Regions:
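Charged catalytic cores and adjacent phosphate/nucleic-acid-binding surfaces used
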Residues: 1-34, 40-60, 65-96, 108-263
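Active-site catalytic microenvironments in core metabolic enzymes, especially phosphate/sugar-handling
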Residues: 101-104, 231
Length: 263
């Protein structure tokens, strides 16, 4: 995978190539959707499928209200959803952990579309842009920077918004965003869904250089989508990422501790 003329030949000659991330290093998948919004399976079905794949944990991160086409959750429904997720987690008796989360929309001005009171109840808050993709670079950059300043955001979802062969990445100063995310203790996502593969390998390498953790997720809307993790692993390997660079290569307890350690 290391064939982009980024120092791999010199490293190989010095026997200094790193042990790159592997599929077996991933302990959980923390971006997925259920029938509560636009997914096709229940919380329990997603958890059972993840357990079959050998994962230690998942996070259920259904959409928030601004994405109306997905039947996104408002504050009241989100609180009910948290309750149900915790019930399923208890039913599974530790065989796999199921963390309550949300994929919250970043509005045009950088505000989030759920209240902080609700976000505070979530273990995993992913903030994502799903609208107004044509904002100028300076405006989009400021929008995303404002969003990740929210103290409850833990992961920036599909950070450039690209859909391969369908939509170009929006204009954003991704280096500034990644640098600030690193300072804040916010991870940036590599969305392994084949339509996205976002961040790209160049930006993943930049994140590694800036000390920003990566969360690799499948954005699954069906139990079968979890197998798409392998596509993302290939991109992480192209970017020289190791197990130490990846947030969800941590154990369940370490993962939660990392999320809760945000300054």
């Amino acid at each position: 995978e290391l064939r982009e003329n980024n120092g791999e030949i010199d490293a190989a000659e010095k026997h200094a190539l790193p042990r790159l991330i592997e599929q077996r290093d991933i302990r959980g998948d923390v971006h997925m959707h259920t029938v509560a919004t636009d997914g096709r399976n229940s919380i329990r079905e997603m958890a059972d499928a993840a357990l079959e794949r050998g994962y230690e944990y998942i996070a259920i991160t259904d959409h928030s209200k601004n994405l109306a086409m997905t039947n996104g959750l408002d504050d009241a429904r989100a609180l009910e959803h948290i309750k149900r997720i915790r019930e399923v987690d208890a039913e599974l008796e530790g065989r796999i952990r199921v963390f309550p989360g949300i994929e919250v929309d970043i509005l045009g001005d950088g505000e989030l579309d759920l209240s902080n009171e609700v976000l505070a109840q979530m273990d995993v808050v992913i903030a994502s842009v799903h609208s107004l993709f044509n904002q100028p670079e300076a405006q989009m950059t400021e929008r995303v920077l404002r969003a990740i300043e929210n103290p409850y955001v833990r992961i920036l979802g599909h950070p450039t918004g690209r859909l391969l062969l369908r939509r170009e990445a929006f204009q954003i100063d991704i280096a500034s965003v990644i640098r600030r995310a690193s300072e804040l203790g916010v991870a940036v996502e590599h969305n392994a869904y084949p339509d996205r593969l976002d961040l790209c390998d160049r930006d993943l390498r930049l994140a590694k250089e800036l000390g920003c953790k990566i969360s690799i997720n499948t954005d699954s809307h069906h139990t079968s989508h979890m197998e798409k993790m392998r596509y993302g692993i290939r991109q992480l390997r192209r970017a020289w990422l190791t197990k130490a660079d990846v947030l969800n290569a941590l154990s369940a307890n370490e993962f939660l501790a990392a999320l809760r350690s945000r300054p």
